[in-house]
Structures are given as C-alpha cells and as structure tokens.
Design a protein with these regions (language model features):
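Surface-exposed cleft-lining segments at the edges of enzyme active sites
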Residues: 116-117, 141-158, 193-198
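Metal-dependent phosphoesterases centered on the DNase I-like endonuclease/exonuclease/phosphatase
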Residues: 64, 84-86, 157-250
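Active-site-proximal beta-strand elements of phosphoester/diester hydrolases
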Residues: 35-43, 133-145, 177
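Conserved beta strand-loop-helix elements of the APE1-like EEP
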Residues: 95-111, 239-261
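Active-site beta-strand/loop signature of hydrolases that rely on acidic residues for catalysis
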Residues: 41, 57-75, 136, 165-186, ...
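N-terminal, active-site-proximal structural segment of metallo-dependent hydrolase catalytic domains
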Residues: 23, 27-82, 86-88, 92-98, ...
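Structured beta-strand-rich core segments of catalytic domains in phosphoester-bond hydrolases
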Residues: 71, 77-144
Length: 289
C-alpha cells in the first residue's frame, strides 16, 4: 500500500518536472561541437532523485553535470542509471552533510578532491576535474551562518580558493561552478535592503566575489545578461518565496577571461524543481579557444 502511494507521488512529481524542463529546448539539447555544463545544488541527492533528477540528468545531455550538497555518505552512494560514462563523489566526514559530485560524458585526465591548504578538507566541498582544454572546479562554498558566525572561515576560504584558481589558470583556462553562497550585487537578490549583512549578502562576502572577478574571472550570466533583474537560483521554502520569485542568485559559472570568446550561452533553469536551488549552466564553443 505504501509503495503504491509513493510510486504515484513520484510519478506525479516527475510528470510535473518533465513539463517544466520542456520549456528549455534551446538550453537542454545536445549541440555538436559545443560543451554544455550544468551545476545544481540538489539539497540531498537521494531526495532529488525521487523528484526527477535522473530524468533531468539523462534528458539534458550535459557534458558535465556538477552537483552540490549531495549529503550522501561514501558507503551509500546511489547507483542510479545516469547516462554518464564517468562520475565521482566527494563526501563530507560528517554524515548527511555537504558533499559534491561530478558526472561526465568522458573520463577526465585527472580528478582531485579539495584544494590547499588542508584546512579545507573534510567537508566534501570541492572537486577539480582536468580535461584537455580546461580545469573544472565544482564547489559548495561554506555558508557564513547566522550572525555571520563562520564569516572568518568563509573569508579564508575565499582567499585560498582565489589563489588556487589563479594557480590553475597559469596552466589552463579555468571554469568554476557551484553554489558560491553569495549574491554579488543588489540585482542578484530580490530584497537587498532587508538582507543587508545577512549571510550571503554581507559586505565581506560580496567583496570576496569582487576580488575573485578582479583576479581574472568572469561571471558568465552577468556577462551575457548585465542588466536583467529578477534572475535567481535559490528561494527559501518559507512563505511561498519561489512562487513569488523572492530569491537570491547564489549559483554561478565563472570562467577565465580567455574563455569569454568561447561563451555561447549562460542560463538559469528556474522552472526546474527538485531542490530549493535550480540548475544553472553554460554552453562553450571550445573551437574558439
């Protein structure tokens, strides 16, 4: 009895999910000669699978699918039928917390967990993939927490991540994606005045993003859509925030400046449900590199 009810519920969710993602054929269809990368904070991969993640992953035909906040333990990694040739999970030492994953259509040259110094290990927050043409860094940036209690650690993280990306960039172009846990400018948050100095919109965190862009990286969405308001990637579950589009743009793709000529598209799939975040993505034409 419970199984039948659960199946019907899942089928209903998946039908809604398919209807919603069908609004994005230009973003989610394979294009010869192009690289498509999608990032999504799934807020628990097992829960998101029940809400249609597998269907989305198999249907959107991304070359790389990067997930954050997977909340899965190494001994319980889901063996789902995703249409990717290669995958890696990086789990936190604390069970049911944080975590990142990367799915790829082809096996990369190398994969690395975390980044120096070792202070940042243990929470499963970063995976670096090396391909022939670029480094891809998938990250789930620490939240500064209530009262900005973890802001000093967050500031150190931002500084160390910036140095790491700059070192990679000397070797190959870099793509950084993930939940960066900051709304950079007022245009990136529905209610900037009410959230001044809240976690994710503090002056310090916003400055950290500014320093990263000044270090030679480009916010792909703002590069192509510099003045478009009301584009968000996270909404609180409270008070119908998503239905009213009272959100924050916390999820990004940043690229090395020399990849800008390759940038074909940057998009936010705000109608795709399954998490309190929605997927974001880019399309690159690496023939222009």
């Amino acid at each position: 009895m419970n199984d039948r009810i659960e199946i019907r519920a899942n089928d209903w969710i998946i039908r809604v999910f398919r209807f919603q993602i069908s609004n994005f054929p230009s973003h989610c269809l394979s294009m010869p000669g192009k690289q498509k990368l999608i990032s999504w904070n799934v807020n628990g991969i097992r829960a998101c699978i029940k809400k249609g993640l597998r269907d989305f992953a198999n249907w959107c035909e991304a070359d790389f699918l990067c997930l954050q906040e997977t909340k899965v333990n190494p001994d319980t990694i889901p063996d789902e039928d995703f249409s990717f040739a290669w995958k890696t999970f990086h789990s936190a030492e604390k069970k049911g917390y944080s975590g990142t994953a990367v799915f790829a259509q082809e096996e990369p040259l190398a994969a690395q967990e975390d980044f120096p110094p070792a202070d940042h290990a243990g929470e499963g927050r970063a995976i670096t993939i090396e391909t022939q043409d670029f480094f891809l860094v998938n990250t789930y940036v620490p939240n500064a927490q209530g009262g900005l209690a973890r802001l000093p650690y967050r500031m150190q993280w931002d500084q160390d991540l910036r140095a790491y990306l700059q070192a990679l960039d000397k070797r190959k172009p870099v793509i950084l994606c993930g939940d960066l846990n900051v709304a950079h400018e007022e245009i990136d948050i529905a209610r900037p005045s009410a959230n001044r100095n809240s976690p994710g919109f503090s002056d310090e965190e916003r400055s950290g993003m500014t320093h990263l862009l000044e270090a030679g990286f480009v916010d792909t969405f703002r590069h192509l859509h510099p003045d478009e308001p009301r584009h968000y990637s996270w909404w609180s579950y409270r008070a119908g925030a998503r239905a009213r589009n009272v959100g924050w743009r916390l999820d990004y793709f940043l690229i090395s400046e020399r990849l800008v000529p390759c940038l074909q598209d940057a998009f936010i799939l705000s109608e795709v449900h399954g998490s309190d975040h929605c997927p974001v993505g880019i399309t690159l034409d690496l023939d222009k590199l």
